[in-house]
């Protein structure tokens, strides 16, 4: 697969994630869009690591680190969303006024 194809796919994923994050009114959807953005970045890390220097695995290792951070972020984000849902009975971002009290 060519470098340009992977970069275009990564740009599409990143754009979809940014668009979804900006227009999302649901917290779960916002978390999913954030995961799309992180996966697009991981694709770039692995692609550039493979394309420019095949012997060193810096991009691959950093990508694994980002995946671990994304998994922790998803777990903590899901816990926060479920806690907000239990208290407010809604996961809509514009209805959540936790910081105004």
Curated annotation (Swiss-Prot):
GO terms for cellular component: chloroplast thylakoid membrane; NADH dehydrogenase complex. Its EC number is 7.1.1.-. The chain crosses the membrane at residues 2-22, 32-52, 61-81. InterPro entries: NADH_UbQ_OxRdtase_chain4L/K, NUOK/Mnh_C1-like. One of its GO terms (biological process) is ATP synthesis coupled electron transport. NDH shuttles electrons from NAD(P)H:plastoquinone, via FMN and iron-sulfur (Fe-S) centers, to quinones in the photosynthetic chain and possibly in a chloroplast respiratory chain. The immediate electron acceptor for the enzyme in this species is believed to be plastoquinone. Couples the redox reaction to proton translocation, and thus conserves the redox energy in a proton gradient. Belongs to the complex I subunit 4L family. This is NAD(P)H-quinone oxidoreductase subunit 4L, chloroplastic.
